[in-house]
Structure formats: structure tokens, C-alpha cells
A protein has these predicted regions:
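NAD(P)H-binding glycine-rich loop region in Rossmannoid oxidoreductase-like domains
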Residues: 50-88, 102, 116, 122
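Glycine-rich NAD(P)-binding loop of the Rossmann-fold in SDR/ketoreductase-type enzymes
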Residues: 51, 84-95, 131, 135, ...
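Active-site Tyr-X1-5-Lys
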Residues: 132-158
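Conserved Rossmann-fold NAD(P)-dependent oxidoreductase catalytic core, especially the SDR/UDP-sugar
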Residues: 95-136
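Rossmann-fold cofactor-recognition segment
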Residues: 41-52
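NAD(P)-dependent short-chain dehydrogenase/reductase
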Residues: 151-197, 202-206, 238
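N-terminal Rossmann NAD(P)H-binding glycine-rich loop of SDR-like oxidoreductase domains
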Residues: 3-24
Length: 247
């Protein structure tokens, strides 16, 4: 039976991912700063910090994971203490990587971000565009990528540059807009509605993580949809499906 370690396993995507992997018959181990009430006979949760060497030593020595899904990160809105964000996202990634090296882990799957480029491009950004993040969160993710790709002959690292992750229970601002549609209210719009913003369905990202296990190489993937709808199109689709009188 395969055993996988999920950092940030009590978080939104970590929870979706562990449920997916458990359905595939795997054993899952989680480490997260927050407590994890999820229960399953093949799941073990540890509450703690990925920078805690003694805890990481225990997890790796006891469970000997075959692969690590590195989902743990402090998010961009944690700006009151930028050193804390950097310590979690960069030093934490380095610690995960070092323990994976020490215990012979052959695969790390890293949930990075698509916010690695500056704003206000005159044309669409391609995969060939050199990352140039302007915010501390994007900079920390890019630094994490560099760490994980530093020794590809020892560990295969698959990196997913993911857009905003959504699923039931995490709709963000769209949840409010969907309530407006349900109530038939007029929808607020930034600009003329032709702007596009990419999301990814959490279960689709979990499937991608599963597929990454088969890769015997290191690579960066910008993951998302080929056809990104405008906000006008998204709103109109939901309005039509719900039979709402919103506009």
C-alpha cells in the first residue's frame, strides 16, 4: 500500500486531495498547523509546523512516505508579518525537501501559484514568459519552486502553477454573487464584464496530483482551462441555469 504525506492536509485543498487519494486505496499522512478532525482507518494527522524538525523526523521515520504532496503555505493576505510568511513558504519548503532527500522520497508534487507575473501585460502571458512576481506570496512560491528543482537527479518534482482553487464550501466572492442571482438581484460588475479570471475545480487539481505520481521526471505545469470565460459569460450561464431574473 502506497503512503503519501500531505503538508497542509487540514486545509481546503489538502482535504479534497486526501479524500481523493484515500479513495484510490492509498494511506495518507497529514501535517498542518490546524487540527484535523477528519477520520479514516488509513489516515493519520499530525498538528504542527513543517519547520519543526523533531516532528518531521517522526513523520518521515514512522510512515516512510513514497511521495509528498506539498500544499502547505501561508496565503497572500498574511502581510502583517512578512517574515512569518517567508519562513513558512520558503524555509518550510526547504525543510520538507531536506527530509524528503534524507528519507529517499522519489517524488514531490508542489502546489505553486499562477501569480508569478507582474500586472498590466499588453498581451497574454505565455509559458515562455519569465516569472517576475511583485508580491511577497508569489516571490515565496517561486523560491519554493527553485528549491524543489535544485536536485532533479535525486527527487522528481512536479510543480503545478495553479489558479484560484474552488469547490463546494469555497466559492469566495462568487458565493455572494450566486446568492444575488438566486435572489434575482442586479449584479455588480467591474468594468464591462469582458474581463476573465481563471479558477480551477479542486477535484480536477486532485486528479492532476494523482496523475503526477506516474511522472519519472521534474517539470512545471501551468494548469487550468484552455477556454476561460468572461465574467459576463459566467454570470449569464448561472442566470440561465437557475432561471433567475438577475441581470
Amino acid at each position: 500500500m502506497s503512503c503519501y504525506l500531505i503538508t497542509g492536509g487540514a486545509g481546503f485543498f489538502g482535504t479534497v486531495l486526501k479524500q481523493h487519494l484515500l479513495k484510490q486505496g492509498a494511506e495518507c499522512v497529514s501535517i498542518d498547523l490546524e487540527p484535523d478532525s477528519f477520520q479514516h482507518p488509513r489516515f493519520t494527522a499530525y498538528q504542527g509546523d513543517i519547520n519543526d524538525d523533531s516532528l518531521m523526523e517522526k513523520i518521515f521515520s514512522v510512515h516512510k512516505p513514497e511521495a509528498v504532496f506539498h500544499c502547505a503555505a501561508l496565503l497572500a493576505h498574511v502581510k502583517k508579518d512578512l517574515k512569518r510568511l517567508w519562513h513558512a513558504n520558503v524555509d518550510g519548503t526547504r525543510n520538507v525537501y531536506d527530509f524528503a532527500l534524507k528519507y529517499g522520497v522519489k517524488k514531490i508534487v508542489f502546489i505553486s501559484s499562477n501569480c508569478l507575473w507582474a500586472k498590466n501585460f499588453d498581451s497574454p502571458v505565455t509559458e515562455d514568459e519569465e516569472p517576475n512576481p511583485v508580491e511577497i506570496y508569489g516571490k515565496s512560491k517561486l523560491e519554493g519552486e527553485k528549491i524543489l528543482l535544485s536536485q532533479p537527479d535525486k527527487i522528481n518534482s512536479i510543480i503545478f502553477r495553479s489558479p484560484t482553487i474552488m469547490d463546494e464550501g469555497r466559492l469566495g466572492l462568487l458565493g455572494i454573487l450566486f446568492e444575488f442571482i438566486d435572489e434575482g438581484r442586479k449584479l455588480p460588475m467591474v468594468g464591462d464584464g469582458t474581463n476573465r479570471y481563471q479558477f480551477i475545480y479542486a477535484k480536477d487539481l486532485a486528479k492532476a496530483c494523482d496523475l503526477a505520481l506516474a511522472a519519472d521526471y521534474s517539470e512545471i505545469f501551468n494548469i487550468g482551462a484552455d477556454d476561460v470565460k468572461s465574467f459576463n459569460e459566467v454570470y449569464q450561464y448561472v442566470i440561465n441555469k437557475s432561471g433567475s431574473g438577475s441581470r
